[in-house]
Amino acid sequence: MKNELMQRLRLKYPPPDGYCRWGRIQDVSATLLNAWLPGVFMGELCCIKPGEELAEVVGINGSKALLSPFTSTIGLHCGQQVMALRRRHQVPVGEALLGRVIDGFGRPLDGRELPDVCWKDYDAMPPPAMVRQPITQPLMTGIRAIDSVATCGEGQRVGIFSAPGVGKSTLLAMLCNAPDADSNVLVLIGERGREVREFIDFTLSEETRKRCVIVVATSDRPALERVRALFVATTIAEFFRDNGKRVVLLADSLTRYARAAREIALAAGETAVSGEYPPGVFSALPRLLERTGMGEKGSITAFYTVLVEGDDMNEPLADEVRSLLDGHIVLSRRLAERGHYPAIDVLATLSRVFPVVTSHEHRQLAAILRRCLALYQEVELLIRIGEYQRGVDTDTDKAIDTYPDICTFLRQSKDEVCGPELLIEKLHQILTE
């Protein structure tokens, strides 16, 4: 199995110039290895002897290197030999990956051999700004609460901000069924193994799985794999975009990626500065998120989930991500407790490309819907205690009358898909008749 792993990662001995650099492990911790290994570069792959365990250089101090292993550090000890391989980690990409499940390093998890694929570096540079095509076309998700007031565009990057247990996974499954996408890349980071299997087998339809590449790094995997999973998924999505495809990338979750990156950074000696996160975590986010979006030919529409602690939407990580993305969808615990799914807080949800990808009629209807919800929320407490008096404000009276129909419109089962024509028709029926 280890020999197959080396072959899949395209690692052959000796390195191309015939010169091998050897070193030895000097210190072993739960997360990182400290080795004497002069001449290495950041991101270089290393092989730990006498086995073929792989590790990556994540820090350099003179002749010493900090290595993050691909597997657990259990069983490793001081004095073991380390060989620098003079190459970086490459991941498989290609059409043959559709319908497959791979781990955070690109190795198959579904019991089948890796097909003939191309190989790319995991950390490509984002497309230059002037090479990208502008966002002009809508990407309809089939979810009324999104398409009605926060329509997404092809190539947009959206954050889904949610506390645990309010329907985030179900919403992701609904987004996987987006009718306007040619292919999907789904990455699950830090999830429980049981939930991963149930999500793939029971939440995703068979048709969706056929056009989806699934990257999985469960919570028990090493921190490097949990970090690398998002890079692997982004690299695969870039391959499809560069071939002119409309790709939907769904990442669950960006928070667990950041926590894994924090684990490595703190072990490497970085100091936490903002919200217990080292500066390296925040500096890596823009480069990673900018890799998605529009390209010269195709597009990557990306949805990143962000876990918020205690429903605090202004915590440092959530605030930083919101500033980098092109929109945000906020899930409400209050709506979930009422059995309102998807539990999307329409008034807190925003798409920055909404004015560009929708018609004037659509924008007018969305504004009316938002105003009705806002007016109802202002007097909701008065209604519940019986103190509201009708006739004082006609706009508020209308908002109260249409509120039940609006709630029915915004609710949707996970198997239901609403087309754009039916969406506008229903909005007309609720808001103008």
From Swiss-Prot:
Keyword tags: ATP-binding, Cytoplasm, Nucleotide-binding, Protein transport, Translocase, Transport, Virulence
EC number per UniProt: 7.4.2.8
Subcellular locations according to the entry: Cytoplasm
Disrupted gene: phenotype observed: Deletion mutant cannot secrete the effector proteins SseB, SseC, SseD, SseF, SseG and SseJ. Mutant is also defective for the secretion of the translocon proteins SseC/SctE and SseD/SctB. Mutant shows decreased virulence in the mouse model of systemic infection.
BP GO annotations: positive regulation of protein secretion; protein secretion by the type III secretion system; proton motive force-driven ATP synthesis
Database matches in CDD domains: ATP-synt_flagellum-secretory_path_III_N, ATPase_flagellum-secretory_path_III
Residues reported in the UniProt entry to bind ATP: G165, V166, G167, K168, S169, T170
GO function term, MF aspect, one: proton-transporting ATPase activity, rotational mechanism
Coiled coil: none
GO CC field: cytoplasm; host cell cytoplasm; host cell membrane; type III protein secretion system complex
SUPFAM superfamilies: P-loop containing nucleoside triphosphate hydrolases (SSF52540)
Catalysed conversion reaction: ATP + H2O + cellular proteinSide 1 = ADP + phosphate + cellular proteinSide 2
Membership in a protein family: Belongs to the ATPase alpha/beta chains family. T3SS ATPase subfamily.
Subunit: The core secretion machinery of the T3SS is composed of approximately 20 different proteins, including cytoplasmic components, a base, an export apparatus and a needle. This subunit is part of the cytosolic complex. Forms homohexamers. Forms a complex with SsaK/SctL (stator protein) and SsaQ/SctQ (the major sorting platform component). Interacts with the T3SS-2 specific chaperones SsaE, SseA, SscA, SscB, and SrcA.
Function text: ATPase component of the type III secretion system (T3SS), also called injectisome, which is used to inject bacterial effector proteins into eukaryotic host cells. Acts as a molecular motor to provide the energy that is required for the export of proteins. Required for type III secretion apparatus (T3SA) formation, secretion of a subset of SPI-2 effectors and virulence. May play a critical role in T3SS substrate recognition, disassembly of the effector/chaperone complex and unfolding of the effector in an ATP-dependent manner prior to secretion.
Protein name according to UniProt: SPI-2 type 3 secretion system ATPase
Gene that specifies this protein: sctN2
